[in-house]
Structures are given as structure tokens and as C-alpha cells.
Amino acid sequence: MPQMDPELFDRGQFQAELALKSSPIAAFKKAIRHAREVLDARFKGGRDIRRLVEDRAWFVDQILQEAWKRFAWSEDADIALLAVGGYGRGELHPYSDIDLLILLDSSDHEIFREPIEGFLTLLWDIGLEVGQSVRSVDECAEEARADLTVITNLMESRTIAGPEHLRQRMQQVTSSEQMWPSKHFYLAKREERKARHAKYNDTEYNLEPNVKGSPGGLRDIQTVLWVARRQFGTLNLQALVGQGFLLESEYALLSSSQEFLWKVRYALHMLAGRAEDRLLFDYQARIAALFGYQDGDGKRSIEHFMQKYYRVVMGISELSDLINQHFEEVILRAGESGPATPLNSRFQVRDGYIEVTHPNVFKRTPFAILEVFVLMAQNPEIKGVRADSIRLLRDSRHLIDDDFRKDIRNTSLFIELFKCKEGIHRNLRRMNRYGILGRYLPEFGHIVGQMQHDLFHIYTVDAHTLNLIKHLRKFRWPELAEKFPLASKLIDRLPKPELIYLAGLYHDIGKGRGGDHSELGAVDAEAFARRHQLPAWDSALIVWLVQHHLVMSTTAQRKDLSDPQVIHDFAQFVGDQTHLDYLYVLTVADINATNPSLWNSWRASLLRQLYTETKRALRRGLENPLDREEQIRQTQSAALDILVRGGTDPDDAEQLWSQLGDDYFLRHTANDVAWHTEAILQHPADSGPLVLIKETTQREFEGGTQIFIYAPDQHDFFAVTVAAMSQLNLNIHDARIITSTSQFTLDTYVVLDADGGSIGDNPARIKQIREGLIEALKNPDEYPTIIQRRVPRQLKHFAFAPQVTIHNDAQRPVTILELTAPDRPGLLARIGRIFLEYDLSLQNAKIATLGERVEDVFFVTDANNQPLSDPELCARLQETIVRRLSEPSAQPQSLQIDI
């Protein structure tokens, strides 16, 4: 720390200020304000961050010493003021904790009670927020023995004022000889680190990471230092080089990474004006600009900055793991190493960990760089790689060049990994962590740490890719067969499972370059297959899956699956059962690996429906498609059988059906038609709206809640219905609107509750929904359709202009209106009002929310039940929707993620 820095704090000038003022508080506050301005200016001017955090700690030392002097401590008083924790290390960010220990020789605090209280009150009055404790030396020993946090803080202490001998005594009584021997300390810190990582989902790749506590954050570096200090007495990272725990290159990487995170943390505190260690969306773009990042190479400035951040913390995690593995071997298993079990001439297993048989293995036989991961997959009982061998792997990465990538031994080993029955995900993750995967596949290296700046994709591209492969593996777990029944069955039937893993590895590899990532990825996948000499059929399937990995999800999401033509077109697209099976399994894994909130029961039901209907179409033969008339006849016949068995007069049913039109029977199953018909025939015409509620399926992990409404068609009926459902905390995923020739509306909605599940067997909730809808629909003109809700913080950072496309369906007499817009309260109700103004009839709607945006599809007709044919009308409609949804009140609403 600096000995003197008059620009930051001029003691003479400060004391002169004190002498002029009746109260010292103003002088202290002025000094603190001035120092903050100076330090912020130095930061913006590019001051070395290490100097900067030391400068701030030095300044706080001066302020505390001046404050301490204002109280009547006798010269021989056995009381001292100590800095502990991060402040004790001499590191302070703008709003870091200032942890103080007032250390006494005696446990009799009373004799110093009054000056201590006065000192702490002064600190509070001048705006210096401190964390303080008052203890005797013996009390320090007692509390440190019982509390890991206390002993950790006391290990890093400095005397600010008072006699130094008190601190030295405290250090003696809390040394590893007295308490917390290094083995126990390491075990406790290991568990603490594990719990901390779990708090942040065990990933470096959170959308809004904590630069201090997240995996790969500053706390991981500090944990290494704490353990090293307890074991070896080392005071800094560089000392670990002398102990043999770090190479010079590793020290340089850790040191530069720490400096980068310090800069980010300093900027966070400065921008937030408070202690803020979360890299929130609020600050990401501002820090990217502050650090000079710019748009380019197909990425926005914020994505460049966050990729740098993620790569830094991944590097810290890698080195932290390496050092902790060393600690395991030196501290926990010192002198207890067991015999080695040979695997081959290059590798052996010792104490459950694989290691090289000699230090030149990778230099002499470079293919061993990939072989080690195959061996671990083939021997799943191996826990991991020993620290020295990890270091050799890291140091051998330069051997992976173009010649290495073309070597048939290496290409064969890489493919062999994907044929292993276990450990594919685990070892790909290790390869990524050790920097091998991105080196062997440069196109994969490009996506390491690549974020997408939205709330839909909550992982970086590389983390999502490995997560997808993990989900493919999990489909084989018996305990998940109930949640993923179809995927679990199909994964074992795929003729070559390794192909779906390879397709998964490449499905998003084209992201971050600009252009269509599916097309770019398909080109890379084809080059990979050629380099690895895969058979033509295998290569073609992988490329097809990569190129079309979004098609099944998009079809299920945005197309009307009740339309036989949609099913026929999709069956023609996949071509055969094998392609359908592979694509379904890949799609389910992709959705689950994108965001845990995406996979809900309704999406599962849609994909199963598309899979099942397509399978039937393939069995029937693509040359024999099911036509509309045949499907209508089948539905009516089956529904009539159900009704007659239940005692319904078939003539009454057919008279009602004659008013409904063909689309009703295309969009509903026979069971639903019978359910609706029986209820309508029994419902008195003058008794208000009929509202029916039931589950779409009895499968536990599939389906949603179906709400059927039968009532006279009225002004603003759709807008009121969806507004009422919003007030009832229901999320609409599907809407089917039928108007009978007798001017009754038959509306069917599929909804999920606010938690993403169906309503289920909950009589009280069902009663609440039914009564709420009936009450709203009795007087729709009086019901407010504009919902006012607070905008969640995260959504405020993803505003964009709504986009509307309008085109006519080539197969059916309807117009398709596709909307992409920021999520917002009452959006469907506003759309319904616009349709009313333009005298449009809504036939069907597919509702989807992807993070911060909606992607909805509406199927509409004009007043004569015909598709829109006037280009000027379509242009006005498009302009109206964009303008209304762009109004200041049209802000994003609460987050409901669905694909």
C-alpha cells in the first residue's frame, strides 16, 4: 500500500479542516467524498486495479486512524483496532465490507465501553459502513475454534491503531497448532465451496453471475489462498509457485483473471453506488461500453464482454480445480498413496484417479491426449485425473494442430468416446474444462463462453450443448422414464445412438457468427463427418439433424396440429420412422437443455401429438394422406357412439352439429366433441355462459387444462376472456375459436397455472376459475381488459420493436398473422380489441412466450369468413398492431417462459 498519497488524503489539510469546524463529521465526510471522486477518476483513467484497491484500503486506514485518535485511549491501553478479512488483506473496492476487530487484552469490555461506542457512532455518522466485533484475545480463540468464518477472517489481519503485540498474540492462539489443523480446515473449506457453488447452480455460466461468489469467481481464488496460508503460511498467489502448486504461466493466468474480475467488481460498485457483486443486466451493457467493447464479428458489444467474462471464470475454475486436487493429494492423502493399477503402457489408476505412467506420455504419443478421456468413459469407476496429469494435459494442448486432427488414431478415439455406454457427457465436460475440446474442434472453441443476450437461453452455447448431451444420457435413466416416456423408449431403439450425440454436439455450433446457425452448423457437421470418415448414411443423418433441429419444435409450436395437411407435410419432411425418432429425441433434449422452465406438460403433449400423428401418417403411407372429410366422419362417428351409450338422442346431437361447421370436428377429438355436446344439450339457453374445465390427458407429465366456453357471441368476447384468465393467473398456450351459425361461440383454451403445471384435481381452484370466467362473461362490456402489472427488473433490458407478418394459408381459407413482441400485460386482450376494430374473426391461436418476448400465431378471417385479400387493409392492420404495442404503456409483463 502507498506510504503517502496527498492527492487522495492530505493529513495536514484534513487536520486544518477539523480545526476550523465545530463538528468533525463534515470534515470526515468531505474527505471520504473527495477520495471517492479521485479513485473513480483513476479507475476511468486506466489506473492499475491492484493499485486502486490498495489505494482505497490505505485511505480507509487514514480515516480510521484519525477517528481513533479522537478518543481518549491511554498510551499503554491494551486495546487495538485491527482490519480483518478482505480489508485485512489491504484490498477494498468502493463499497466493500470494512471489517474491523477491536481487540482487547482482557475480556472486561466495560472499561472501554464508552470510547468504543463513541468511535463506532462516529464511523456511522460519517457514512463509513463497517462490520465490527469487539473481542479479547481469549474470546477470539474461543469463537475461532467454533466458527470457520471467524478463523478465516482472523487469518488476514492488520493493526490499524494500537499495540501490535495484541494481534501477534491473537495469531498465536489461533494458529494451526492450536486449532483448525490444515486437514480439518481444508475439508471445511471444501464443503463451504461446494455449498457456495450449489447456490449458483454449480455453473460459471449464470445469466447474471456473481463476480465474487459464483463458480470461477473471486471467492474461488481466495479459497485457494486461505488453504495455502493455513497449510504453508503463504501470503499470496506467487508464493504458490515456489511451493510447486502453480507454474509461472498458471500464476500469470490467475493473476490476470483476478485483475479482470476486480475491474468488473470495481465498475459494478461504482455504477450501482452500493456494494453490488451481481453482474446484473442493468450493468452488463454499461460495463461493456466502459471497457471499450464494440459490436462486431456477428456479436454485440455486451456479448463480446460476457464471453470474455465467462472464459475468464472458466479458466479460474479449471485452475482452482487443479490446485484443489493438489491439496487433496498433499493434505488429505499425504503419505497414504496406494499402489498403481496399470491400464496400458501409458496410463494407470492410483487411489481411484487416472495418471500417466511417465511425464513424457503426451509428447511421445500425442493420441494419448484423447485416449485418457476414452479410458475414463470405459472405466466409469475412475473418479478423475490426478493433478500432475491434468497439468501435463494442459501443457500439451499445443500438440493439437491440423496434423493431430487428421490423424486416424485421434479421429477414431474421438468417435469411440461417443460409442461408450457411460461417461460421454462427463468426459466431454472434462475435455471442455481442460481446453482440449475447443482445441480439437476449433468450431467448438468459438462458442465457448458465447452467450445470447436474452432470458430464453440461460446457458452459454457450449454449456447448453453439453447439457443437451447430458439430457440424452439421462433419457436412459429408469427414474426418468415416467417424465420422458417416449424419449426414454426411443433412445434405446435408435440404431446408432452415437449419431444423436454427435448431432447434439454440432446442433448450435454455428451460433455467434451471424447468419442461420442451423445452416452454418450443418456445413461444420459435414466437414466433421468427412474428417472422421463416417459412412455416408451416418454423415447424412447428422447433417440433416443439425440443419433441421428446430423444425419439430417450430411445427408443434406454431402450426395447427389438427389440420391433416400439417401432419402430412411434416411426415413428408421427415420421410421415414428413423428420422422421426432421432428428431423427436433431439428436440426434447434441446428444449430441456435450453432452460428448465421451457419443458412443461403442454409442450410435452404437443410434441407427443405431432410424433404420434406423423407416425400414423408414415404407416398409412405418404401416398395415402388422411383427408379432411374422412377425419370429420371418423370424429363424428366415434363421438356419436359415446353419446348414444350415455343416453343422448342422436338427432339432438346431429342438429347441434349442423350449426358448428367442419373446423370444429377437425380441431377436437371425439371424446371432447361428446363432452361438449352432452353439456350444451343439458345447458339451459338462458342460464348464462357454459364453462367446462378438465385435463387434456391423464398422463402426469403431459397435457394441460382445457377450458371450454359456450355462450352467445358478444362484443369483445375474446378480449374479455383472455383478460379474465390473466387475472386468474392462467397462462394461455392454445386457443380455438368456433362461431356457430346460431351465433354462439365455442371457445377452447389450453392453459397452465402460474407454476407451469396444469390445474389438476383441485376442486377449489376449478370452482374459482369457472366462477371468475362466468362473472366476467356475463357483462363483457364492463370488464377491464387492460391489465396493469409491475414490470420485472430483468425484462426492462430487452425492449424491441414489435414485428408483424401477415400472409394467407396456402392450404386453408384463413390468414396467418405472426407476432413477435415484448411480453406485456394484457397483450392478448389488446390484440383482441384490434381484431374487433378491423372486424376480424379469430379462428385459432398458438401462444408462446420465450423469455422476454412472445411469438404468437393467429389464424383469422374477415367478416365473411374469408381470408384477407386487401393489401392496404393488411398494411393498416400491421401498422396498428405495431403502434399499439409500442405505446409507452405497452411494457413487458411478468416472466412466463415457454418455447
From Swiss-Prot:
Residues 706-784, 816-897 form the ACT domain. Residues 343-705 are annotated as: Uridylyl-removing. GO terms for biological process: regulation of nitrogen utilization. The keyword Repeat applies. Its EC number is 2.7.7.59, 3.1.4.-. InterPro entries: ACT-like_dom_sf, ACT_dom, HD/PDEase_dom, HD_domain, NT_sf, PII_UdlTrfase/GS_AdlTrfase, Polymerase_NTP_transf_dom, UTase/UR. Signal peptide: none annotated. Uridylyltransferase (UTase) activity is inhibited by glutamine, while glutamine activates uridylyl-removing (UR) activity. Keywords: Hydrolase, Magnesium, Multifunctional enzyme, Nucleotidyltransferase, Repeat, Transferase. CDD domains: ACT_ACR-UUR-like_2, ACT_UUR-like_1, HDc, NT_GlnE_GlnD_like. GO terms for molecular function: [protein-PII] uridylyltransferase activity; phosphoric diester hydrolase activity. Residues 1-342 are annotated as: Uridylyltransferase. It catalyses: [protein-PII]-L-tyrosine + UTP = [protein-PII]-uridylyl-L-tyrosine + diphosphate; [protein-PII]-uridylyl-L-tyrosine + H2O = [protein-PII]-L-tyrosine + UMP + H(+). Residues 461-583 form the HD domain. SMART domains: HDc (SM00471). Its cofactor is Mg(2+). It holds the Pfam family NTP_transf_2. It comes from the Bacteria. Has four distinct domains: an N-terminal nucleotidyltransferase (NT) domain responsible for UTase activity, a central HD domain that encodes UR activity, and two C-terminal ACT domains that seem to have a role in glutamine sensing. HAMAP family: PII_uridylyl_transf. Modifies, by uridylylation and deuridylylation, the PII regulatory proteins (GlnB and homologs), in response to the nitrogen status of the cell that GlnD senses through the glutamine level. Under low glutamine levels, catalyzes the conversion of the PII proteins and UTP to PII-UMP and PPi, while under higher glutamine levels, GlnD hydrolyzes PII-UMP to PII and UMP (deuridylylation). Thus, controls uridylylation state and activity of the PII proteins, and plays an important role in the regulation of nitrogen assimilation and metabolism. Belongs to the GlnD family. This is Bifunctional uridylyltransferase/uridylyl-removing enzyme.
